From Swiss-Prot:
Protein family membership: Belongs to the sigma-70 factor family. RpoD/SigA subfamily.
InterPro entries reported in the protein's UniProt record: RNA_pol_sigma-70_dom, RNA_pol_sigma70, RNA_pol_sigma70_r1_2, RNA_pol_sigma70_r2, RNA_pol_sigma70_r3, RNA_pol_sigma70_r4, RNA_pol_sigma_70_non-ess, RNA_pol_sigma_70_r1_1
Localization (cell): Cytoplasm
Residues forming coiled coils: none
Self-association state and partner proteins as the record states: Interacts transiently with the RNA polymerase catalytic core.
Residue range(s) of DNA binding per entry: 569-588
A single GO cellular-component term on record: cytoplasm
Stretches the record annotates as Sigma-70 factor domain-2: 375-445
NCBIfam families for this protein: PRK05658.1, RpoD_Cterm, sigma70-ECF
Name recorded for this polypeptide: RNA polymerase sigma factor RpoD
Species of provenance: Buchnera aphidicola subsp. Baizongia pistaciae (strain Bp)
Span list, region Sigma-70 factor domain-3: 454-530
Length: 609
């Protein structure tokens, strides 16, 4: 059985340490046949030399060996083991080095272990815990609940769909269902492959029951009013108020908000926190420059429960040499503190409470983000296995992987472990949907809508069936009859389905000509037409030269020969200062002369057959 390169190199280093030297032939015998790059071989020889092992053309004499043996005896076994491990790790990285992005991606992906069903549930629970932590924190921000209730009012008025507000509801008492349907779903997943291009709204997430949603929102609204009443009549830190706030959080975290609504609530909280930080930075800048207050002390001031306490602490820490200078910026600091108090009035929370809520939101988001990252990285192999089936359809393999990864991330966001099926079963649909959608949108030079792509695929499938049945390509009439689509639409689809081709496409075996060389340029006159026109002009000029000057000019003006346009009898008459009747007579006489066989024969050959 052939050993791997690392094992062979380890034996080589051990052998070299024992005898004190290595010959080039011994190195060549021990190295794998896969190592053929001269740079890799040079690196290996250099590292062996650095370990104190001589690399020579032939075995050295006995004196040199004795000297090397004395030097080698000074080295401990630990030193040898450490040096061997170092060279092995270095060579291992050299052997695995590649510039191919697909191989680099595969190698990085291979370091992540696959998940078991229990591992998936564990990560899904961590994601859910992180989201619950965010929602429980947001529930303490009154504006968030108000916004959600306002959005539900829009749903009841028909201005917003319920599916645009929530995905559904989480039952905290429900456990993951272990069913036997998973294998059945996996078995039949290929049968539903033709449904990959359906809209995202038609995924396997069940539609939210409007009656259940109404009950949940009524419960949320009632608890919100109870909590507000407790805050107004009692202190927010009162035991009864804290119980009501906790009840509100428990109800609110059961709502599975769509990402857009969830982000809106968090962003509003972030904006409020940003306002506070801006004002605190302004206070810190003034106090440090004009009051000589240490920055560390200021940070302690900003952690106080009430805004008015910040001002008193600042005043207490101003030392005598700085009092006069600080008095000049008193109004500015008091103005900033008023802005902070305005934020407290808008939110109904103290600055300390807003910071606390924001901190818990950040921790919850970080927890959910880490868990989602683990779930995505553990299922990257699934994306590659699906993307392989869609190669040669107009997109690079790496592009297919990236689009599939986007679908995988959507699946992680929407996965519900309580349903009982494995994550891979659910994610497969989203990955396929993302890949097929990207192929429809990006694979063609001229984008075709998704619904038309489906029609084209159906037409191609039926066309192949008819070809197998009758042995020839079907006509548009036959396709129309089989697909129950009007014939004119069939012709339109066939026209759209044609792929564009580059004019630089090589033609012939030598590739010395391109397709564009054989296409007619309709903007340029054909050589035959150009030669015919030149001959006609010459013949006409020759024929007219046999007439009188007056007759030739009348014919030129009447028929627009060598002129921009023709002229009427009156216009020609004015030119010659005669009547239109006289011009008509001159024209008739000149035409009779041209009809003479000696002249007409010259022009007759130009008449169209």
């Amino acid at each position: 059985m052939e050993q791997n390169p690392q094992s062979q190199l380890k034996l080589l280093v051990t052998y070299g340490k024992e005898q004190g030297y290595l010959t080039y032939s011994e190195i060549n015998d021990h190295l794998s046949d896969n190592i053929i790059n001269s740079d890799q071989i040079e690196d290996i020889i250099q590292m062996i030399n650095d370990m104190g092992i001589q690399v020579v053309e032939k075995a050295p004499d006995s004196d040199d060996l004795i000297l090397h043996e004395i030097k080698r005896n000074n080295e401990t076994d630990e030193d040898i083991v450490e040096a061997t491990a170092q060279v092995l790790s270095t060579v291992e990285s050299e052997l695995g080095r590649t510039t191919d992005p697909v191989r680099m991606y595969m190698r990085e992906m291979g370091t992540v272990e696959l998940l078991t069903r229990e591992g998936e549930i564990d990560i899904a629970k961590r994601i859910e815990d992180g989201i619950n932590q965010v929602q429980c924190s947001v529930a303490e921000y009154p504006e968030a609940i108000t916004h959600l209730l306002e959005q539900y009012n829009r749903v009841e008025l028909g201005e917003l769909r319920l599916s645009e507000l929530i995905h559904g509801f989480v039952d905290p008492n429900a456990e993951a269902v272990h069913t036997s349907i998973t294998n059945h779903i996996n078995t039949n997943s290929e049968e539903h492959h033709h449904n990959d291009n359906t809209e995202e709204n038609n995924d396997d997430d069940h539609l939210v029951d409007p009656e259940l949603a109404r009950e949940k929102f009524i419960a949320l609204k009632n608890q919100y009013h109870i909590t507000n009443y407790a805050i107004k009549t009692k202190n927010r830190n009162h035991q009864d108020t804290l119980i009501e706030i906790n009840n509100l959080s428990e109800i609110f975290k059961q709502f599975r908000l769509v990402p857009k609504q969830f982000d809106h609530l968090v962003i509003n909280m972030r904006k409020m926190m940003q306002k506070i930080r801006i004002q605190e930075r302004n206070i810190a800048k003034l106090c440090i420059e004009y009051g000589n207050i240490p920055k560390k002390a200021l940070l302690n001031f900003f952690s106080l429960q009430k805004t008015n306490q910040i001002w008193s602490k600042i005043v207490q820490n101003i030392k005598k040499p700085w009092i006069d200078k600080f008095n000049t910026i008193k109004p500015d600091i008091q103005m900033i503190l008023k802005k902070l108090q305005k934020v407290e009035e808008e939110t109904g929370l103290t600055i300390h409470q807003v910071k606390n809520i924001n901190k818990r939101i950040s921790l919850g988001e970080a927890k959910a983000k880490r868990a989602k990252k683990e779930m995505v990285e553990a299922n990257l192999r699934l994306v590659i296995s699906i993307a392989k089936k869609y190669t040669n359809r107009g997109l690079q393999f790496l592009d297919l992987i990236q689009e599939g990864n986007i679908g995988l991330m959507k699946a992680v966001d929407k996965f519900e472990y309580r349903r009982g099926y494995k994550f891979s079963t659910y994610a497969t649909w989203w990955i396929r949907q993302a890949i097929t959608r990207s192929i429809a949108d990006q694979a063609r030079t001229i984008r075709i809508p998704v619904h038309m792509i489906e029609t084209i695929n159906k037409l191609n499938r039926i066309s192949r069936q008819i070809l197998q049945e009758i042995g020839r390509e079907p006509t548009p009439e036959e396709l129309s009859e089989r697909m129950l689509i009007p014939e004119d639409k069939i012709r339109k689809v066939l026209k759209i389905a044609k792929e564009p081709i580059s004019m630089e496409t090589p033609i012939g075996e030598d590739d010395d000509s391109h397709l564009g060389d054989f296409l007619e340029d309709t903007n340029i006159e054909l050589p035959l037409d150009s030669a015919t026109s030149a001959s006609l002009r010459s013949a006409t000029k020759n024929v007219l030269s046999g007439l009188t000057t007056r007759e030739a000019k009348v014919l030129r003006m009447r028929f627009g020969i060598d002129m921009n346009t023709d002229h009427t009898l009156e216009e020609v008459g004015k030119q010659f200062d005669v009547t239109r009747e006289r011009i008509r007579q001159i024209e008739a006489k000149a035409l009779r002369k041209l009809r003479h066989p000696s002249r007409s024969e010259i022009l007759r050959s130009f008449l169209d057959d």
